[in-house]
């Protein structure tokens, strides 16, 4: 009971800090966005404001990820379980991702068999979509020069698998060992070594576990990184 109280207090503290950060951050983003609309700005000023907007959005995403990771870790994230079609959810996530990230150096290929139109499971639609989106973003984050991303939904008896892989730079055997056996390695600062996989993958693992599943990390058949949930 005492441990549970400490876990709840920690989760509430993180939620409070997240809220306190989001409020001034929203003001910074709002003012920066407003200033960007000024026709009298010099090119340098536009670039600097654009950096402020992008980095503020990045910080906001990190705060949201930290809050979600904390709630998932301490079973404080409400789950809305319903019968969903995993194929449709992941396909829509891919479509939304393409529409909001139109960079040509990150083409996404949908490799799910045409015959697999439906794969029904009891799951939280929002969390499954979040997990798939995090995997797509992970490939982009770790391949700044670009890569092709391959998405497959597979059915195995009464379970569904989501496979996201790329043909990017991949990871070493040492990094793979740490990612598979030391979950908190995924949270380490990316400045410490050349390859880190922050809160995004940790959240994917937590979402899989909430649904009674697992996350497997490995080398892609295309030469890059692969994650299966």
Give residue ranges: language-model regions.
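Short alpha-helical segment of the dimerization/phosphotransfer core of two-component systems
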Residues: 54-59
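Short conserved segments within the C-terminal catalytic ATPase subdomain
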Residues: 100-112
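Acidic ATP/Mg2+-coordinating residue in the GHKL
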Residues: 166
